[in-house]
């Protein structure tokens, strides 16, 4: 069998956690089996909308995550002639029919069925009375019941027997055909529906394995019946469990913190996102960290869990911190450079990114946090916090601060190593309590008593700023002495 999977998002919203996990599972299976992966944009539901931005976002995110595709992207709106041609053939062969029932009649039908405890579904009225008229309309190319106005096209679903399929996550699933109604395959505006287009696409593109969310389970028997009516091969189905937020509610595309673009903008790495998502519903022993090669090697549908998974942002932060500190430094520099460009960050152009990575990776969970930590040290300030200044910027610290200034001013080659050595030698020469003098220097430089090591602070701020800030702290202490 030539394995072929697909990822078929609808451009009704930006890609979210659930979308990408589905894409990842389908991609991993295709790559593991040496098969092909197809990207398809299911845009018939948005045919009258301007969704270019969303489509660009889908393609951009897929490329950023390096989930490459072998075919596509295909667009359903460019295949309308194909769908309509098949619908025409189905009408001619009496496996579909025109339905002229008004919305008022259908609403009343649903209401009466619900009142009597029945499952709401179409009663097949036009199936029995319109079959002859459907053929007549095809032959004469005119609408016979012009007084009835617009119509939809429905599929003649079998009304007896069962439809069964083996789901590779849940096992055998069976539906009674009598429980399924004649679904609409073409709307009154002439646009084919999702349930029909997806069938034709999977058939034409020779999709062998359909990987999608469990919310599509009820669509599967309807789609299988259409495939059978078209005498097409039935693909294998894999319905993955839903993803919940930490309140155990469904994480949907409308959830503020589910969009992949948002995570990219927040400074998360592709490796961290994919590693986190592959573990949402799949496991391989107790292993947590997986490279892409390991994912392809170990991934199997049989290990996907049936129960819903909970997405934990703290877990994603943990993965991101791991990859920031374990990927090659040049990889992180590349990501950081791209992030700075995308976010239009202009205030760190002069900073050596390798220094930024080496100095802040241990205490940063995201690229955004890494830049924030840098900015926190470099930001200028005019006012010292009184409580902290009162404790550390005291008259006895004036001479130690002046001595530090002199030593730091003498550094000709400003590197992290020369700064570290100078600070160490200065503390030794002062023969003072490092906690006290170190805190005074820290408050002088960043206005706070919390920061990374002093050598990092001094190096990142830069020589000129360090000297200016020490002078300002000394002036501040002197001003208090004169009050």
UniProtKB/Swiss-Prot annotation:
ATP binds at residue 253. GO terms for molecular function: ATP binding; glutamate-tRNA ligase activity; tRNA binding; zinc ion binding. The keyword Ligase applies. It comes from the Bacteria. The gene is gltX. This is Glutamate--tRNA ligase. Belongs to the class-I aminoacyl-tRNA synthetase family. Glutamate--tRNA ligase type 1 subfamily. It catalyses: tRNA(Glu) + L-glutamate + ATP = L-glutamyl-tRNA(Glu) + AMP + diphosphate. It comes from Blochmanniella floridana.
